[in-house]
């Protein structure tokens, strides 16, 4: 992860120190040891970041190393960057307006301090925080027997991020899900951070999830080997098989471009699920929907919300035949059913949200409930993350009640 942003980290760290040294420190730091102490935090951050980049895989196996990196950034880089931005802006205004005081410097001190405390809060208090969100979704073709059907969705738990003082959080989350006594539990991907080695200690806990119609799941981008430093095809296949077998050993119904039927007496609905949409791309929507009659209610599980567009009626039915009332995986001209409700995760709601502004807002359908062409999508903020920080984008489990429109 750090390897992909090493150059921005170096720039983000060094430039503020250069500005502060040039504007405020050059005349005050007269001795060599004073200058060394001034520059030491910046070079420690850069050296540590470089060290992490040479470790194999997307993330180091020991998550404590990432925690140390975030603390170092919070102390040695973020406040300095914020202060420098305001100081530079104030200096430019002072020069343009021929003023005598740089008010940006004072404002930068305040905002830099706020940024520091927000960073620490998000790391220590914001990340563990969790809410139970309840929504009611109305659909036109829900069978009578499924009126009031309750689904609990959880996503992006990233079990490799829980250890030490965070170790109790998965138990809390699973207990909260079971307390809802749902009809169906849906997991929408990213069980691990990097490797299946993170999972065995949680098998008993995940197996304890209980719902009348069981637990159904799909794989997220982290549930493959994309973030591992592995090239051997046999090893890749073995690692991905371990992930699939682990979920099945927990009693979950893993949906790999396929669907299952849920019955209530003579009525039924379908739950479909696709593999990952991007990096790696394994998805096959038409295969997942094969055999579903038109007019049926379909709940679709997809890890990435940007794939939702592929399930809209205008997209999925670009070509139609005269009597194609059954979906075919290979017949591109067959008439296909558009899932009325899709559940996704992946975005974590940006993990930082301030006044409704969040990094993921430029990603389509990044958080919340959306409706297009009679189809609805709910994208959850998820429960965890590879980056152990949340500010304003609270982790959640989602309780969905289905009602007939």
Predicted feature locations:
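Hydrophobic alpha-helical transmembrane segments in integral membrane proteins
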Residues: 116-142, 161-165
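Beta-strand secondary-structure signal
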Residues: 85, 134-136, 399
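Short, charge-rich amphipathic segments
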Residues: 16-27, 97-114, 136-144, 172-185, ...
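Short N-terminal secondary-structure initiator segments
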Residues: 1-10, 96-101, 128-133, 157-170, ...
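Non-catalytic terminal accessory segments
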Residues: 1-128
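Soluble catalytic domains of enzymes that build or remodel membrane lipids, polysaccharides, and related
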Residues: 145-405
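Generic structural motif
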Residues: 88, 95, 140-142, 405
